[in-house]
């Protein structure tokens, strides 16, 4: 992909406006997870080292536009950046008509979603953002699938528009996996419903050599192959769709599964009741009417791990079982370790996938972990991300 990169630009004395994703959880004024802030720091530091006058902006939460509320202010983020950067980072609440900032200094602009017109990508608001800077840097991959004034609109009007290091790294990794994958390529796509991952499955079926499915998605594929899935979560209306996908790409199905008796499961306390439920390993053809499939069995986990070991590119989206409960997490654990130990280039994305990576402590052995969530899925679906498309146009 051809786009301008912040790292290639001369920023000395330039006013640089950086769109980061600083949407962190805040409870009683305290940031409870700083992962996104830590991810943004290298970009901010790099701009400072290049001699830029740096303005950073982001959204936080889902405020009503034009109705700022203290609990949705970026004030805790300004305090965090002040400490992390070793310089006072002032928070500007009134910035649309200009901001005073010197070279080597960082300021934070208040929550963009306080500004009327932000979500609807109002061109007048986008032009006001653009007027603040000499260079606009888009570095928030997690919001790249949204055409908003601070992500897409500003990039149209800024004198120069470039990708920050975080965004560039995401696009490079996704491009490597989706556009120029080294073969054989294997994708793991798991989740509760085929319907929510249908575009992902269709897109990957045209790229992958093998498509490993898990969770409720695997149950729908098992039903399509004529197996009884008992009381397992599956989508009867998408059985034909599963057959069509399986006709396009190799979809290795589980040969054994881990089940629980559905009568032992309380859906109002799903994980709690699963923790007390008995896990039973069964051949897939032995699943009975009252069984609920909650993980792949050890034989299947080993077979899937062997597929991953011999692949050159792995894209992973979703755990293959209810890994939050240990007796239904062995399949996800085995696949996590197989991805980690494989020599393949691996990219992983999606909230549950990241939680599994954390649980099994394999983050350092995954080639690239996408922070994008919805943007990651839309890229994998083959959709154009508005904030990326404008950077390609401006290149």
UniProtKB/Swiss-Prot annotation:
<feature type="binding site">
    <location>
        <begin position="350"/>
        <end position="353"/>
    </location>
    <ligand>
        <name>ATP</name>
    </ligand>
</feature>
<keyword id="KW-0067">ATP-binding</keyword>
<feature type="binding site">
    <location>
        <position position="146"/>
    </location>
    <ligand>
        <name>substrate</name>
    </ligand>
</feature>
<dbReference type="InterPro" id="IPR001576">
    <property type="entry name" value="Phosphoglycerate_kinase"/>
</dbReference>
<comment type="subunit">
    <text>Monomer.</text>
</comment>
<protein>
    <recommendedName>
        <fullName>Phosphoglycerate kinase</fullName>
        <ecNumber>2.7.2.3</ecNumber>
    </recommendedName>
</protein>
<feature type="binding site">
    <location>
        <position position="324"/>
    </location>
    <ligand>
        <name>ATP</name>
    </ligand>
</feature>
<dbReference type="GO" id="GO:0043531">
    <property type="term" value="F:ADP binding"/>
</dbReference>
<keyword id="KW-0418">Kinase</keyword>
<dbReference type="InterPro" id="IPR015824">
    <property type="entry name" value="Phosphoglycerate_kinase_N"/>
</dbReference>
<dbReference type="InterPro" id="IPR015911">
    <property type="entry name" value="Phosphoglycerate_kinase_CS"/>
</dbReference>
<dbReference type="GO" id="GO:0004618">
    <property type="term" value="F:phosphoglycerate kinase activity"/>
</dbReference>
<comment type="pathway">
    <text>Carbohydrate degradation; glycolysis; pyruvate from D-glyceraldehyde 3-phosphate: step 2/5.</text>
</comment>
<dbReference type="GO" id="GO:0005524">
    <property type="term" value="F:ATP binding"/>
</dbReference>
<feature type="binding site">
    <location>
        <position position="197"/>
    </location>
    <ligand>
        <name>ATP</name>
    </ligand>
</feature>
<keyword id="KW-0808">Transferase</keyword>
<dbReference type="GO" id="GO:0005829">
    <property type="term" value="C:cytosol"/>
</dbReference>
<dbReference type="GO" id="GO:0006096">
    <property type="term" value="P:glycolytic process"/>
</dbReference>
<dbReference type="Pfam" id="PF00162">
    <property type="entry name" value="PGK"/>
</dbReference>
<dbReference type="InterPro" id="IPR036043">
    <property type="entry name" value="Phosphoglycerate_kinase_sf"/>
</dbReference>
<keyword id="KW-0963">Cytoplasm</keyword>
<feature type="binding site">
    <location>
        <position position="36"/>
    </location>
    <ligand>
        <name>substrate</name>
    </ligand>
</feature>
<feature type="binding site">
    <location>
        <begin position="59"/>
        <end position="62"/>
    </location>
    <ligand>
        <name>substrate</name>
    </ligand>
</feature>
<comment type="similarity">
    <text>Belongs to the phosphoglycerate kinase family.</text>
</comment>
<dbReference type="GO" id="GO:0006094">
    <property type="term" value="P:gluconeogenesis"/>
</dbReference>
<keyword id="KW-0324">Glycolysis</keyword>
<feature type="binding site">
    <location>
        <begin position="21"/>
        <end position="23"/>
    </location>
    <ligand>
        <name>substrate</name>
    </ligand>
</feature>
<keyword id="KW-0547">Nucleotide-binding</keyword>
<feature type="binding site">
    <location>
        <position position="113"/>
    </location>
    <ligand>
        <name>substrate</name>
    </ligand>
</feature>
